[in-house]
Amino acid sequence: MKKKYPILSLLFFISIGVFSQGNANDKDTSSKKPEPPKDRNMFGLHIPRGLKVNSPDVTDGYVLFAVPNSASFYLVNRRGEVVHEWKGNYAVLGGYLQNDGSIIQNAVDPDFPVFAGGGEAGRIQKISWDSKMQWDFEYANEEYLHHHDFAVMPNGHILAIAWEDKTAQEVVMAGRKPNMIPKAGLWPDKIVEIEPDGARGGKIVWEWHIWDHLIQDYDTKKMNYGKPADHPELLDFNVGDTVPPMISQDSMDVLHKQGRAWRNQTPENEGSEVYHFNAIKYNADLDQIVFSSPNLSEIFIIDHSTTTKEAAGHKGGRSGKGGDFLYRWGNPQNYHHGDSTDEKLFGQHDIRWIEKGKPGEGHLTVFDNDIPNAAHMPYSAVYELSPPVDTKGNYFLEKNGTFGPEKPVWVYMAPDTLSFWGSFVSGAQRMA
């Protein structure tokens, strides 16, 4: 369902949505297909298909989106007509249209092992306008897996989110509480920069691991012991949920047969997927990366101007802070400030900087999916944030020890709240 507003276009598909305003030949190049049903059953809600709003105020351009569980990407015009289709070889999650008409997308590797938790990908591909595979890079094995989202940098490199496997013993040594450690260990997130090489190759030229930026106040004997309230630049390793009681293998088998379990989900890895990074963007002017963790109800900014060695530490780079968080927003409880009334984000997706030349350029927008509502069902909102910076452009803490702002500079939500809700995924982009 797509809704159009004077300064914001919202894509509200159950898929990862991306937008394009590039030039395209306004001609349907897709083959004729049978007419689909008039509505689609989404969680018991029968949502009408097709174009919903097309007002005179619509912004010129096209909309690009992927179809869940298919290998196709579509470009549609503002009349809802298909302009072009790119066809890949695996189920696609999301992607970005390039100036040459190609798509860079992430797709689900058919054989990825170990990991489970939603958003699994494992492959990043470049597909030409005429659907020829130009690059097919696999980042999936028993030690790591690319998932959810990636960003295309101006130099053609790719910044990709990935899980990495840590054994239960490694997690114990990092100071996590025993009741928060699954038998299979944990899968903390990392970010890798990939330089494409040939038709299938890629070189990792930079990387950042959240594992290197943990703090905990549980075990005084561990190297990362400290007070999280004094170090908002680090992540409290004991924030999160305790491990649920382990179910039997028979029960897990039933869940798999019912389609209610992820492909590699086992009784032993329940709770292994902890932070669930689900969106990433790059700002070339700042040389900074922003990413989202709905499990933490926070968005984070880190410095990309570091070397990989500096990114693993607390010094270096343009900021002088290495790979530590430069900024975070959404839930100050995670660094022991405030209470539940200070939580701003609930299962959010699609963090991004507003582009140059558009209202609010340099600000951030985020889609807040699942805002609690005691009187009715949850609802969604889009926030525009202006992170406070000093005269040198450095993010700073407010007097109460938290990162601002206290409130977004702009908010969109439905007047009745109920008519605007995306239970997961979803996104927003400032258009004009």
What are the residue ranges of the model-derived segments?
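Histidine-/acidic-rich catalytic cores in large beta-rich domains
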Residues: 21-432
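Bacterial Sec-dependent N-terminal signal peptides
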Residues: 1-25
